Amino acid sequence: MIELYHSEGCPFCVKVRVAFEQMGVAYISKAMPLRVTSCFKDELIKLGGKSQVPFLVDPERGLQMYESDDIIDYVKKNYIKS
């Protein structure tokens, strides 16, 4: 299952979460404070090299990505049946 690292107050994260909800996409939520100071910070840096959110991890395909529009496009192409 895909994992989404996000912050509640981040507008780009909200955009991704709303899109996932509208598309009916199931995901593991890795919520953190807006200022990434939580235990997820080290995990984010280890996975992707920076502590930016939103950050998507797709363990089935070995993919990690940043950027809300890229995340939404990727999920549409790979998880939504036309």
Residue ranges and their predicted role:
Residues I2-E8, V14-S82:
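GST-like domain detector, emphasizing the conserved glutathione-binding G-site
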